[in-house]
Structure formats: structure tokens, C-alpha cells
Design a protein with these regions (language model features):
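Flexible loop/turn connectors
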Residues: 3-102
Length: 102
């Protein structure tokens, strides 16, 4: 996909580790990050700030999500089948140097 004439200008990876794989593939294809390809990851893991250029990523509230999941398991373990619950969590875009405006 990165060697195509109509290649994408940006890739959103499912997590930061996958984004590192995109960095490797982009460099093998001779692409510069972010000049030729913007890359965004997800999870804001430590590697996102250590690679070059530092990865723009999405941070999710891991503890809050874990706490909500544990609360739901406790409710279900106590015999409450209840209705399915829909919860939403605030995500944060951590802008670093792997993206640019086109």
C-alpha cells in the first residue's frame, strides 16, 4: 500500500506497537515521517515518545476503563444480570511529531 502511486497520506494504527511497524514499512518504502506520511497510534505507550519522530497517539483512560470493567464483573458476580451498560470514556489526542497538516 505504501508503494502505490495513490498511497495514503496518513495511517491510523490500532495501537502504538503496530504504528512502529508502519514506521519500519514507511522507511523501507523511502517515505519520510511526517513529510510523506503521517502516522497515529493508540494507547500512548512509552515507545510512542521514544521513537523518532515521536509518535502522535491517542491516550485512553486505562485505569478508568479497568475500574468500570471490574465494577461490572462484581455486579454480574453478585447475581445481577441487569441490562447491558453502555459507557463512554474521554480519549485524549497526544500530538507529537509524526503528523503534519496537508
Amino acid at each position: 500500500i505504501l508503494n502505490r502511486h495513490d498511497r495514503p497520506t496518513a495511517i491510523f494504527a490500532g495501537n502504538d506497537e503496530m504504528a512502529v511497524g508502519v514506521y519500519v514499512a514507511a522507511r523501507k518504502a523511502g517515505l519520510r515521517i511526517p513529510e510523506d506520511l503521517s502516522i497515529v497510534g493508540f494507547d500512548d505507550t512509552p515507545i510512542s515518545a521514544r521513537i523518532w519522530p515521536p509518535l502522535t497517539t491517542v491516550r485512553s483512560p486505562i485505569r478508568e476503563v479497568g475500574r468500570a470493567a471490574a465494577d461490572l464483573l462484581v455486579k454480574r458476580g453478585a447475581g445481577s444480570s441487569g441490562n447491558q451498560e453502555l459507557q463512554s470514556f474521554q480519549l485524549e489526542l497526544v500530538v507529537r511529531e509524526s503528523t503534519r497538516t496537508i
